[in-house]
A protein has these predicted regions:
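Short, acidic/hydrophobic/Gly-rich beta-strand patch recurrent on exposed beta strands
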Residues: 26-31
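Histidine/acidic-rich helix-loop-helix segments that form or flank divalent-metal centers
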Residues: 174-177, 187, 192, 200-205, ...
Length: 278
């Protein structure tokens, strides 16, 4: 149930087209008082009455008027007021900081062939890698989110590798961690004016997922273990993993990447507001 007294943070926003051809907006709002989530929608007429920037992830809104839809467990927004606008993503200084950290981790790869391959991929796509999000709603859904998520995973990897009692290949860990979400630069678009994040329609016609992109890239270049780690980093087939970690005799590196990816996605700086709370 929505409240006109409480403030709401925009968690995610996307637009869709109905079967009749009408445009509609979908929002996930977080009640800043209770922490509860609210699924919302706006019909095209109401959507057009608001600035596109109103629904930027991280924005703080007040619901002025809406209708609760108990049968669908959502509410139809009619009018909202923007209370505080969130920034779009990383600023130049933050981007430079995370980019330099990424380069420092790539330099830790001792195998020259593997290091040069990773560096080539990241350098070739650096403009996109610096601004693309890591997700639409789940985590790091802001400009520069992919860069932040990747560096966080590398930090978790560095901290935890020495704790593994079994033998693991550090070069493969650093390489797979750096490249595991590279495919997201082709999978997502972000509007640098409004912050709206959308899927690239043509991506899924060429690749099933960003995991498949990374897997194919590394496998065709001769880095089989790195490819396998990327294939398994979602953990379970029903979560999008190409290799399900429920299978027997899985190499420890495959579990490792999945676990550190999950830690960043749940406990890292998953939204831009967290950068202003330091």
């Amino acid at each position: 149930m929505f409240s006109t007294d409480n403030l709401y943070e925009v968690v995610s926003f996307s637009t869709d087209t109905t079967k009749t051809g009408n445009k509609m907006g979908r929002l996930l709002l977080k009640d800043t008082t209770t922490g509860s989530m609210l699924n919302c929608m706006l019909w095209e007429e109401r959507l057009n009455q608001h600035s596109p920037k109103t629904f930027k992830p991280g924005n703080i809104l007040r619901i002025i008027s809406a209708t609760q839809n108990p049968n669908y467990n959502n509410c139809t927004l009619e009018n909202v007021k923007l209370i505080k606008e969130a920034r779009l993503g990383l600023n130049e200084e933050e981007t430079a900081f995370y980019w330099n950290k990424l380069q420092s981790y790539i330099s830790k790869i001792k195998d020259e062939k593997l290091k040069n391959f990773v560096l080539e991929q990241i350098t070739k796509h650096q403009d996109s890698f610096k601004i693309k999000p890591a997700g639409i709603s789940m985590h790091h859904n802001f400009a520069g989110g992919l860069l932040v998520h990747t560096v966080e995973c590398l930090e978790f990897a560095e901290l935890n590798m020495s704790k593994f009692a079994c033998e693991i290949n550090e070069d493969n860990i650093y390489a797979a961690t750096t490249l595991h979400d590279l495919g997201k630069i082709f999978e997502y678009n972000i509007d640098l004016e409004t912050g709206a994040i959308t899927y690239v329609d043509t991506f899924k016609t060429d690749f099933i997922s960003h995991s498949q992109y990374g897997y194919c890239l590394c496998l065709t270049n001769g880095f089989k273990m790195v490819a396998r780690m990327i294939a398994a980093h979602h953990g379970r087939a029903d979560w999008g993993a190409i290799i399900d970690l429920g299978e027997r005799d899985i190499e420890p590196e495959l579990y490792f990447l999945h676990l550190i990816d999950n830690m960043s996605a749940k406990y890292g700086k998953i939204n831009i507001k967290m950068f202003d709370e330091e």
